[in-house]
């Protein structure tokens, strides 16, 4: 897989829906075959994915929201790489 660029725009793949699930008391990613429960960090990143904003814009917003988090850009990019590998999101 190629390295994620800050200029790329992530979006959820067809069939995937991100939402808060009260019964699980967490954000989840729903897809036809099931559901993925997300931790707070994953939910914070995926909340920013809207199909219009770049990876760089998402990183900047999360850096502003969590200024004490060192290495946040690397963590966000690494998570997005996993999300692409698992076919949750796609990049354009």
Swiss-Prot record:
**The keyword Phosphoprotein belongs to this UniProt entry's keyword annotation:** no
Q: In which pathway does it act?
A: Cofactor biosynthesis; pyrroloquinoline quinone biosynthesis
Q: Which molecular-function annotations from GO does this UniProt entry contain?
A: quinone binding
What UniProt keywords are attached to this protein's entry?
A: PQQ biosynthesis
Superkingdom to which the source organism belongs: Bacteria
Gene Ontology biological-process annotations:
pyrroloquinoline quinone biosynthetic process
Annotated Gene3D superfamilies: Coenzyme PQQ synthesis protein D (PqqD) (1.10.10.1150)
User: What does it do?
Assistant: Functions as a PqqA binding protein and presents PqqA to PqqE, in the pyrroloquinoline quinone (PQQ) biosynthetic pathway.
Q: Which family does it belong to?
A: Belongs to the PqqD family.
Summarize subunit and interaction data from the UniProt record for this chain.
Monomer. Interacts with PqqE.
Write the protein's name: PqqA binding protein
Native species = Stutzerimonas stutzeri (strain A1501)
């Amino acid at each position: 897989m190629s390295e994620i660029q800050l200029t790329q725009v992530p979006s959820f793949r067809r069939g995937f829906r991100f939402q808060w699930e009260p019964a699980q008391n967490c954000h989840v990613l729903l897809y036809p075959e099931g559901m993925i429960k997300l931790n707070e960090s994953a939910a914070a990143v995926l909340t920013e994915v809207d199909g219009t904003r770049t990876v760089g814009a998402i990183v900047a917003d999360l850096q502003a929201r969590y200024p004490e988090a060192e290495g946040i850009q690397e963590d966000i990019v690494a998570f997005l790489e996993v999300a692409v590998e698992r076919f949750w999101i796609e990049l354009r």
